[in-house]
Amino acid sequence: MWILALSLFQSFANVFSEDLHSSLYFVNASLQEVVFASTTGTLVPCPAAGIPPVTLRWYLATGEEIYDVPGIRHVHPNGTLQIFPFPPSSFSTLIHDNTYYCTAENPSGKIRSQDVHIKAVLREPYTVRVEDQKTMRGNVAVFKCIIPSSVEAYITVVSWEKDTVSLVSGSRFLITSTGALYIKDVQNEDGLYNYRCITRHRYTGETRQSNSARLFVSDPANSAPSILDGFDHRKAMAGQRVELPCKALGHPEPDYRWLKDNMPLELSGRFQKTVTGLLIENIRPSDSGSYVCEVSNRYGTAKVIGRLYVKQPLKATISPRKVKSSVGSQVSLSCSVTGTEDQELSWYRNGEILNPGKNVRITGINHENLIMDHMVKSDGGAYQCFVRKDKLSAQDYVQVVLEDGTPKIISAFSEKVVSPAEPVSLMCNVKGTPLPTITWTLDDDPILKGGSHRISQMITSEGNVVSYLNISSSQVRDGGVYRCTANNSAGVVLYQARINVRGPASIRPMKNITAIAGRDTYIHCRVIGYPYYSIKWYKNSNLLPFNHRQVAFENNGTLKLSDVQKEVDEGEYTCNVLVQPQLSTSQSVHVTVKVPPFIQPFEFPRFSIGQRVFIPCVVVSGDLPITITWQKDGRPIPGSLGVTIDNIDFTSSLRISNLSLMHNGNYTCIARNEAAAVEHQSQLIVRVPPKFVVQPRDQDGIYGKAVILNCSAEGYPVPTIVWKFSKGAGVPQFQPIALNGRIQVLSNGSLLIKHVVEEDSGYYLCKVSNDVGADVSKSMYLTVKIPAMITSYPNTTLATQGQKKEMSCTAHGEKPIIVRWEKEDRIINPEMARYLVSTKEVGEEVISTLQILPTVREDSGFFSCHAINSYGEDRGIIQLTVQEPPDPPEIEIKDVKARTITLRWTMGFDGNSPITGYDIECKNKSDSWDSAQRTKDVSPQLNSATIIDIHPSSTYSIRMYAKNRIGKSEPSNELTITADEAAPDGPPQEVHLEPISSQSIRVTWKAPKKHLQNGIIRGYQIGYREYSTGGNFQFNIISVDTSGDSEVYTLDNLNKFTQYGLVVQACNRAGTGPSSQEIITTTLEDVPSYPPENVQAIATSPESISISWSTLSKEALNGILQGFRVIYWANLMDGELGEIKNITTTQPSLELDGLEKYTNYSIQVLAFTRAGDGVRSEQIFTRTKEDVPGPPAGVKAAAASASMVFVSWLPPLKLNGIIRKYTVFCSHPYPTVISEFEASPDSFSYRIPNLSRNRQYSVWVVAVTSAGRGNSSEIITVEPLAKAPARILTFSGTVTTPWMKDIVLPCKAVGDPSPAVKWMKDSNGTPSLVTIDGRRSIFSNGSFIIRTVKAEDSGYYSCIANNNWGSDEIILNLQVQVPPDQPRLTVSKTTSSSITLSWLPGDNGGSSIRGYILQYSEDNSEQWGSFPISPSERSYRLENLKCGTWYKFTLTAQNGVGPGRISEIIEAKTLGKEPQFSKEQELFASINTTRVRLNLIGWNDGGCPITSFTLEYRPFGTTVWTTAQRTSLSKSYILYDLQEATWYELQMRVCNSAGCAEKQANFATLNYDGSTIPPLIKSVVQNEEGLTTNEGLKMLVTISCILVGVLLLFVLLLVVRRRRREQRLKRLRDAKSLAEMLMSKNTRTSDTLSKQQQTLRMHIDIPRAQLLIEERDTMETIDDRSTVLLTDADFGEAAKQKSLTVTHTVHYQSVSQATGPLVDVSDARPGTNPTTRRNAKAGPTARNRYASQWTLNRPHPTISAHTLTTDWRLPTPRAAGSVDKESDSYSVSPSQDTDRARSSMVSTESASSTYEELARAYEHAKMEEQLRHAKFTITECFISDTSSEQLTAGTNEYTDSLTSSTPSESGICRFTASPPKPQDGGRVMNMAVPKAHRPGDLIHLPPYLRMDFLLNRGGPGTSRDLSLGQACLEPQKSRTLKRPTVLEPIPMEAASSASSTREGQSWQPGAVATLPQREGAELGQAAKMSSSQESLLDSRGHLKGNNPYAKSYTLV
């Protein structure tokens, strides 16, 4: 039974399972029509597909599945339908012109495609033609390609030809979308060509050419519009583009007006009027309607009326898109349709049409709604909505997925064994839709409610049904197989398991079983009780199984009988259960086998209507009784059909006495007995013989028109209609008609002849057959009526003017025929003068003749012969051309050359006769035409000719004649022309070459001989190439303008040290002359371009390295190799670099000896020639080999206890390799025993234990490398002591570390007891305990750690260890390495393309400089470049810079710690300036009537190469300039083709890299006789600005007066400046002696006054200025872009105070003495504040956190207020606790960035002090207490007397460096206070003097320079502040300082003299330096200083008014 249950469950699962991941879809849903050529065949893929793979089938539209027809039709396995090529005789409408569809089917369902109409196009001959057209000149012509209607649908016009030349749509010719050719703006010459169209068959690809048609062009004549092109109706789909043609002929040009549905159409947006008509873009359904094109002019109106049908594509959409439901539910689908209103809609399910039924409802007006109730599993699948309208169709589909509602067992009970009286509960949890019903059985017997079994049921929240079977007290009879069965409308499922109740085994009685023969049967043994031994089955005492069809399952007692057979399997079966070994029980069951009926198959034969039918149904086997019944089409047969059924025993027969069509259908015979019911079905088809529905009758057909011969029939199967034809009216001899595109059989059987021809007349037979009965046929006669046709007429004809002309035409057709003649659409009256018409009949034809007597020119035109009869009319157009002699041609000059003249002519009226030739006459201008040279019979096909062999520059006269067949024309117009120049015939002379560099050659030459120039030499071509014997290098060509008889040119960018060949050619306007003879020269030698390659180095010993390399190629040497240079240096262990050395050799290898052992060396190799060193190779690194190390640098030993000592040592000074270990030796002499101990290579101490007390030991240490043991250290004696004194094993020395790192200072001490350790630091010579804080601490082992070490941590540290028995001390010198200080960068030399920079390095920060990074940027650019520079360099030259351009530079030094701070930005300019034109040169070298030579030698390039030269000129009074542009400047330039006797404006613009210059001039060409013309001043010429020339003259006089005044003022300034220079020279001579005195003082110590240490200093860090006095204590940093802004109140009365804004704070504790700060602002450019010049953008900012900070002392508090730019560093008053506050304010001077300000810039090494001030600054520096340890160096130099502009570094374009100036005086130009060595503890103090640029800046001088001046001035004044305020600069970025509390000044006594004041002034500690209080004192009196003060302040007080900048001296 279990097997049965599982089998049932599996069968249900197979039936109702579904792959929800399967799908169906359409690949190409738009495929609805396939048209192909019969000669090619076609492949049609099925447009449907699916996943998993689908089964594809093709059907006809009738629903019949198609089959393969060999060689004609085949369906491929992939579903592709193939139609093979076929001849026309094999055409079958059923196959080749039919509607198909395909289906795709997989487990998801089945879908069918849209109907696909497949149509074959038969190949048939056809012709296309074009008709002649008429039009008027200037109007439009339209040609149409006429295609036969039978093939019109398949033919496309692809192109048009004009005399075999393809036309392209353009300005005059337009090919429309319909294939018409439009010719716009028709000209007479358009009528000279033939036009034809080219067509292509869309499916066969065949092309056809039409006949040639002519265009007859007439002169414009007033006429009403006549339509040339129009339309009647158009059909289009929405979204397409539609063109509605409408074009008319008329004069004047007609107007067009469009109407839609009788309303004017607005032509905008999508509606556009075009040349061809109306263009509608993106059409819409609303655009459908009637369109009218109205064409009108004043002579009439014409219309084109048509209709536009816009169809919207059909679209069907089913909703919802996804349907997922369950069995038994309702599903509703809706299909919405767009694109049509009257459509046919149908529904399909799985490809089959769906009709309304019991559970199916279709509702809606258009059947758009589908409702399905009580869905069953078979209702799932694909549903489609089909919409059909005419030939269009659309569909949509949706997949309806029905969830499997079949009941499923979720969980159930399991087999178990229970004891009697034990309760049992069985559960079945079932899921299904709808909810299933659960029943229980026990051994196949139903279990009813009540008794011992309790059944309950519930529904869970998940929708599951749970049924429980409970047994409260089980008994043995309750045992057995329990089954729960769940069923609903979707199916049934069961589950069973055995419940065993312990007790005696027995068998429950079993019921007899009925089995069906041929099927499987299961017999279950109903055993109860448990346990038992076995279950066995017997049949007739035979143990089963005994054959293959019997299976006994011993474990559950089930017997299976497969394929039951009545004879064998029927009988009694016994189940035997073995209860105990000797005890068994049994039960029997009887099995009865029933045999089901079997019907012998039968089929209906072929029957025809009216016949009798008898069909028997015989049941050949099966148990009786058997009942037999019949059905038709699945239903009982109604009695009305007259069908008789006879049943006898096991047979039944069906009889029909009179067969009719209503008997068609499927008949089923059904046989039933007790076993089963079976059926057999067969189809009865009643066949009907054919008969006519419509019989053919005699008809008339009109020639050229279509005719339908009616014939239709009916029958079953559908009859076939065949037409046959017999030509003529005789006895019919019928033959099959060959069907083609012209003759076709319609679907109803009628015959269509699309274009009737005369040969179609005759008998036609319509034959109908369908293989049922006899065929039927009927004949008819077709009579062809011929309309009137013109069969013969001349298209064109000619007549000679004044002679008689006849024209005839022949007409054919049904009589009578009327013929009339027309001229230009006007009927000719035979009675008209000069016209005579005659008509006669000749057989079937009518001939009409028109005579013209005589012909005149006006007769030229179009005549038409018009024939008319009852069936039609025809017309023949004849073009008559009246011929006469031609008009003369109009000639013009096409081209003039030196020896040829090319004519071009335009032919006038040709006399209506083709031109037969031309005659050309040519003569010298002075000769008569009788002597002219004649060229006759020039081809008429030509319109140009060339006259050859003329002389250059000669003048000729030329004329022409035209000839045709009638005669010769009059002579043409006469032309006079002068020949052009010819190319020179001679080469340039005296060509010389001179190499001037390694890449340049200077070329000089002279012009060719005069008689060979053939014109004016305008330039030359220089050809040069690398010269090689046997080589064939092409010449490189350079064009050069001429500058005179002697020329010079420099070739640049040549290859170095290379031989070149050079030629020169002269050029004039005509071309280039012959080349000069090739000259050879060689460029100069240069340094090698590349380094040696393959540089290799191998260490051969600890002190030597072997180096080898490859030599350079010849191309890389650039000269003759002189040798190689090897540069090498050691890379030391601490990162420092050793000495750089070099060795020279001539060989490609070298051995380096005497090197350091085990040292890494950097090696570079270069090659050098006679020109110098080449490029170095890349560095390679090689280390020398290891050697034994040196002895340890130091050894210490100390007793740690009575039996132990410690030994420590330092590593060897010379490691010579990698230390592998250290060996410690210990020995004592009595007895001599030496012990060895090994220590690791990173250990520097060792403990030796187990020694004897009070015994001396000797210890020493040896280092070991891989090369062996090194030398021994010194021997130390040590003695173990019980009372061991404190000893430190660490060595004294120097410890170096980078800053910002953690450093540990070791101090390892030993002793007994353990010593105490303390650390001291030396501060100013006084040791003090180190500070222990968060950054400093002492470890337990005595080591001292400093975290994040800083520069101030440097110094001497002492470690002291002591215990009871002694003490020890070491001193460690900690040196903290910091990034290097900024270098001082200067400009040492400038050229036009390079700048040489030099620098002085700053403090290296305790680590050697590793290199420099130079950054540079072009002015006004934000892009910076950089170069790495070797640390040994102190200068660098930047090459290839732009000439006359400003550049910015910064420099950064790098050491082992990292890069230092960036130097100040300096600026320098390469030499050169913009071009200038010399006033000494004349611009115009020569002027004649039409040419001017300009002298360009006057242009000075300013030192920079000219990059462009632009010249423009124009006649006065015109606005258009003639422009000439060059990239280089020649010596001269010639203006050609000028107007005679005309004034011209000329302007030139010449540019180089430094700038551009312009020059304007006026000139006048000469009269034809060489005389000059009147000047411009005599006429009033209106210029562009509207000023007359007289007004311009007034303006010129005004400007001249102003210039004269400025010039006089300039002369006055020069005189004043000269006097001041003389006074300055005198002061310099006076200062020389003072300099000598100061230099002698340099060797002795200056007496200084005792001063208290300054505690208050204010720091102001301003870029581009440096303070040369440093103080590192008590300082703060203020923004590096700041400016000090001092208000008047700051230096006013003490009671006045002001507030300010604070952003940076500096605190001061007390007031310091004002000894006067010294400020150097010399590196700032006067007038150009670097911080406010936004275009001077530098790289990283120059601020630094670790470098020394510059400081300023407080000045006197009572000085007046001023605002200063950042060009200054100012002393600022401060009080205790005062605060700096910063605010930003900007004020930009208009002249700050002018080039004048640039030219007066001073370099970063300049200062504006006088020589006296410099000397006094030096003397004052020696008095400073902080500089007492400094070493002073004084540099004596010469100071130039030139202006500050000439002393500016890098700004003078005429000097290369500062030293180029002429020296005039010597003296001190720099002194330096050098810092002492670090162990001396000194500070660096540099010194300089302030620079005051303006008279009012006297207040900024330090007290020792200004006290004598101020103290020697008396008298009150009120204008002091005002005067100083006027002398100040405009503020830039400023800082406002708060007014501090004014301290009471200490009075000072005036010195007796200025010198005593300056040299002897002393200051009291803690006092404030002040000036004497002078109420109302006027500072303006400062201008009245004495000569001594003037000497002190030199130019400061004298530059007021003229030059605001002071004299500057350069500090080197």
UniProtKB/Swiss-Prot annotation:
Primarily expressed in brain. SUPFAM superfamilies: Fibronectin type III, Immunoglobulin. Residues 1617-2012 are annotated as: Required for netrin-mediated axon repulsion of neuronal growth cones. Residues 1799-1809 have a biased composition (Low complexity). Residues 1-17 form the signal peptide. Residues 1718-1810, 1855-1883, 1971-2012 are annotated as: Disordered. Phosphorylated at tyrosine residues. Phosphorylation is enhanced by NTN1. Glycans are attached at residues 28, 78, 470, 487, 512, 556, 658, 666, 710, 748, 795, 924, 1142, 1160, 1250, 1271, 1341, 1488. One of its GO terms (biological process) is retina layer formation. One of its GO terms (cellular component) is axon. SMART domains: FN3, IG, IGc2, IGv. One of its GO terms (molecular function) is protein tyrosine kinase binding. InterPro entries: DSCAM/DSCAML_C, FN3_dom, FN3_sf, Ig-like_dom, Ig-like_dom_sf, Ig-like_fold, Ig_I-set, Ig_sub. Disulfide bonds join C46-C102, C145-C197, C246-C293, C335-C385, C428-C484, C525-C575, C617-C669, C711-C766, C809-C865, C1307-C1359. Keywords: Cell adhesion, Cell membrane, Cell projection, Disulfide bond, Glycoprotein, Immunoglobulin domain, Membrane, Neurogenesis, Phosphoprotein, Repeat, Secreted, Signal, Synapse, Transmembrane, Transmembrane helix. The chain crosses the membrane at residues 1596-1616. The keyword Chaperone does not apply. Residues 18-1595 are extracellular. Pfam families: fn3, FN3_DSCAM-DSCAML_C, I-set, Ig_3. CDD domains: FN3, Ig, Ig_DSCAM, IgI_5_Dscam. Cell adhesion molecule that plays a role in neuronal self-avoidance. Promotes repulsion between specific neuronal processes of either the same cell or the same subtype of cells. Mediates within retinal amacrine and ganglion cell subtypes both isoneuronal self-avoidance for creating an orderly dendritic arborization and heteroneuronal self-avoidance to maintain the mosaic spacing between amacrine and ganglion cell bodies. Receptor for netrin required for axon guidance independently of and in collaboration with the receptor DCC. Ig-like C2-type domains 7 to 9 are sufficient for interaction with NTN1 and commissural axon outgrowth. The transmembrane domain is necessary for interaction with DCC. This is Cell adhesion molecule DSCAM.
